[in-house]
């Protein structure tokens, strides 16, 4: 069954090593076989994923991922992986997550034309600082030379480009706006289940009582800070709030984002 699949135990056995190497990672991104994990790891099996430039400093490779890689093949393999993971216990709908889908959103929608896309929006100063913090920590697992300021500059520019690309895709004539839902990160933190209810309602999806109860239990069992607090500041990574907000100005205005306290 879904609950006793032997792959669960095999997967869980891989995580203690991460906890030993970078114990602070759990506070940023808890991992477990029964927890959600980002598609960026499955995309890595195609060798087309920002995961590698997160873990290692390989800018020329990431340039190729950004501008030349074949995302049609990425999502063909992505579908095979979902079929492999779910063939014993088929469900009505997958819930998938990763910012890396910005890179190939057009091909994701071609592969899964009935997909419903939730965009999470946040003050880019906070987003870029958090991303730089996570990347700096992950790179420290394999290198003694980690430049957090370079990481922030590099990824801020790349993510801005991919964000603009994904907005161009969704603004095209091929995809109805009802296929997309806008969510502010701060709203989700304040009322996780309330936002989930809005998502289900917006997409016309049934939310069963059993599913709602399980979500509420999970939220109660996993409060913010359960595994420690992830602390970071723009100054540590050379993130200039004024410059970043000016650069992302059209994005912030379009989606009604206000500057967060730093």
Residue spans of the language-model regions?
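Long, contiguous hydrophobic alpha-helical segments, chiefly transmembrane helices and signal peptides
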Residues: 82, 94-95, 119-121, 244
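Active-site-proximal structural scaffolding
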Residues: 71, 98-101, 110-113, 120, ...
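PAPS-dependent sulfation machinery
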Residues: 1-94
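Flexible, glycine/threonine-enriched loop-and-boundary segments that flank and lead into catalytic domains
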Residues: 87-114, 172
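PAPS-dependent sulfotransferases, especially Golgi type II membrane carbohydrate sulfotransferases
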Residues: 63-75, 86, 131-182, 186-262
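Conserved phosphate-donor/acceptor-positioning beta-strand/loop module used by diverse small-molecule
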Residues: 97, 108-133
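Flexible loop/turn segments at secondary-structure boundaries
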Residues: 73, 101-107, 125-128, 189-192
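Well-ordered alpha-helical segments embedded in enzymatic catalytic cores
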Residues: 77-81, 104, 165
